[in-house]
Curated annotation (Swiss-Prot):
Residues 677-686 are annotated as: Calmodulin-binding (1-9-14 motif). Its EC number is 3.1.1.4, 3.1.1.5, 3.1.2.2. Changing A341T: In NBIA2A; complete loss of phospholipase and lysophospholipase activities. The keyword Repeat applies. CDD domains: Pat_PNPLA9. ANK repeats lie at residues 120-147, 151-181, 185-215, 219-248, 251-281, 286-312, 316-345, 349-378, 382-403. Changing R741W: In NBIA2A; significantly reduces phospholipase and lysophospholipase activities. Homodimer formed by catalytic domains tightly interacting through a large hydrophobic interface. The contact area involves 3 alpha helices, several loops and a part of the beta sheet from each monomer. Both active sites of the dimer are in close proximity adopting an open conformation that provide sufficient space for phospholipid access and favoring cooperativity in deacylation-reacylation reactions. Each monomer has 9 ankyrin repeats stacked side-by-side in an elongated structure oriented outwards from the catalytic core. Four different transcripts were found to be expressed in a distinct tissue distribution. This is 85/88 kDa calcium-independent phospholipase A2. It is linked to Neurodegeneration with brain iron accumulation 2B: A neurodegenerative disorder associated with iron accumulation in the brain, primarily in the basal ganglia. It is characterized by progressive extrapyramidal dysfunction leading to rigidity, dystonia, dysarthria and sensorimotor impairment. Calcium-independent phospholipase involved in phospholipid remodeling with implications in cellular membrane homeostasis, mitochondrial integrity and signal transduction. Hydrolyzes the ester bond of the fatty acyl group attached at sn-1 or sn-2 position of phospholipids (phospholipase A1 and A2 activity respectively), producing lysophospholipids that are used in deacylation-reacylation cycles. The lineage of its organism: Eukaryota, Metazoa, Chordata, Craniata, Vertebrata. Keywords: ANK repeat, Calmodulin-binding, Cell membrane, Cell projection, Chemotaxis, Cytoplasm, Disease variant, Dystonia, Hydrolase, Lipid metabolism, Membrane, Mitochondrion, Neurodegeneration, Parkinson disease, Parkinsonism, Pharmaceutical, Phospholipid metabolism, Repeat, Transmembrane, Transmembrane helix.
Amino acid sequence: MQFFGRLVNTFSGVTNLFSNPFRVKEVAVADYTSSDRVREEGQLILFQNTPNRTWDCVLVNPRNSQSGFRLFQLELEADALVNFHQYSSQLLPFYESSPQVLHTEVLQHLTDLIRNHPSWSVAHLAVELGIRECFHHSRIISCANCAENEEGCTPLHLACRKGDGEILVELVQYCHTQMDVTDYKGETVFHYAVQGDNSQVLQLLGRNAVAGLNQVNNQGLTPLHLACQLGKQEMVRVLLLCNARCNIMGPNGYPIHSAMKFSQKGCAEMIISMDSSQIHSKDPRYGASPLHWAKNAEMARMLLKRGCNVNSTSSAGNTALHVAVMRNRFDCAIVLLTHGANADARGEHGNTPLHLAMSKDNVEMIKALIVFGAEVDTPNDFGETPTFLASKIGRLVTRKAILTLLRTVGAEYCFPPIHGVPAEQGSAAPHHPFSLERAQPPPISLNNLELQDLMHISRARKPAFILGSMRDEKRTHDHLLCLDGGGVKGLIIIQLLIAIEKASGVATKDLFDWVAGTSTGGILALAILHSKSMAYMRGMYFRMKDEVFRGSRPYESGPLEEFLKREFGEHTKMTDVRKPKVMLTGTLSDRQPAELHLFRNYDAPETVREPRFNQNVNLRPPAQPSDQLVWRAARSSGAAPTYFRPNGRFLDGGLLANNPTLDAMTEIHEYNQDLIRKGQANKVKKLSIVVSLGTGRSPQVPVTCVDVFRPSNPWELAKTVFGAKELGKMVVDCCTDPDGRAVDRARAWCEMVGIQYFRLNPQLGTDIMLDEVSDTVLVNALWETEVYIYEHREEFQKLIQLLLSP
């Protein structure tokens, strides 16, 4: 027993040693009958607790004099007297005005506030305590406009920051507090309310006060600036409803610029929706638009969708693309480029974005700019070309690769002009160990797209084989353009068409009489039909992938359908535009075996051949071209299984004709035969050129096993599963293969009947999925396409000559 007694005493001593001396505890007043009363103020008594050798402060319950609350228990008399004086001057209004104070938890909170904030008035304490009845006490009312010494804030400031609307009403209606006061930082009650979480407080302030709504603090921020900086979207909405001004300058410009600087998309959208002119506002420091301040792709995309000028310039002449390149914001730069940013815009000191990318040693950015049309030999105001800036790159490997790249595009390695020296002499590079010589570049390695591949791309872009002659508008032969399927890899087709247009100087629509497309090729065929530029389509594809390929497969069809409606019109019919003739492939899946269907913008030719199947089954015929909606035709041709759900009874045309060349030639032959049967032989035009564009050839890889059999052990089971997977992939690839024998058959057919056949399809270094969304991967694919164009420049030159000939 003695052992347990000593253990209890020891534990009690340790507990007392580490216990909080200011912990509020409910006690009986009778426990202090033997203690001396050192001080007494109202219901507050300071006892000298002789047995424990402590000084205890007890608040006697005004409603029950037999009980009380010990507020502290201190060992030093001096500390006890200081705290007693502090408590006695602050507690009286609270226990006199509200019985809620007489609870242990409330008293603990209140006494902690008194100690932690010695400069607070009773009104400040009442706000933080949050008991409404206290604000009816005369002493608290008298302190309603007092400012504390820590921040210079009034009780109303605290109520706003706390977000307590009920206390705010008490202060305004019963205490008649002033609402136009500021703290030491110059912040009004609106600034404090913005930092809270209750937008109703802002609404109450807006109804009761106008002063301070648009006032700037010592940092030059209005409440609206601060709300944008903190990302308080609801606060921004309420401030705008209270008529907060959007045109007050802050240190970073208008509130819209603050929202952009801190990437607060919701706040920026709210401001623009309330005042659309803010999207064009310029900040005072740089003269920059909100788009210049965009730090990520999402913010830039939001502004561009709302009509922001993508090529707006700052005071220094820089566009948003200049800023994105300077800050190495690749994703943001891609968004700007795909929305029409001028890749050759001259900014401060005449620098183009490519000049800046060179100085930043950003290879991916350089690729993107060149792919989107940036010129590599443009000098700035100092006569410096991108070549010269590339020579300053610190890393030797990168420097040599980029300099070689620029040399291969025809850029001259020249120094800035020297005063007093003729331009021809001043621009000549002196002989030194690093001078560039015109040497043949090493073979291209498309399997490993690294820096050395940069050196070849611009040669593809250089219009070395541009022909000035225009074709005869009354030519007697037809030209056919065939576009493969391939999802987002349709970008490769677009890049090939851009090269053809650039070399010929003629729009694709005017170069071809027939256009056939499957899936993504079908969308591009319709784009050609409706006179959409290929540069626009390139940007459109980059934008489309982010809208359509969201989540996991199969993707929702809604975004794709809305996209097609937006681009081609919700009510546009196939026959609304009849030149050139366009056909899109689709697969009718409501029958077995499935059949190929062509969506046309002309009447289908009548054939004399016997039906392939006996019509014992009542199958609904497809819609006539005059009734067929364009967007539905595009949706039906691109309904790739496992990627999107079927569009009614239509599946992706790639299942039967991923390379539509032979089907298109068959259609043209049947069309001409129908004209002859109808006595219109004079309208028949012989097909003279067939151009087939692919979406890139994936690299060939070995397959270890396609054996599927009945397994007899776990090892064989695993082997069978793996073989079934590989076999399934092989079957799909064989069904949708646009190359191989499909190309051989088309070429052979054309050679037999004297038709010029061109198959353009670059070899890719990596396998790219139909739903690829990585900007870097897609830019590299376009880069490889440009390299391919350069390597096949003679074939391109021959093609252009034939297309432009009568």
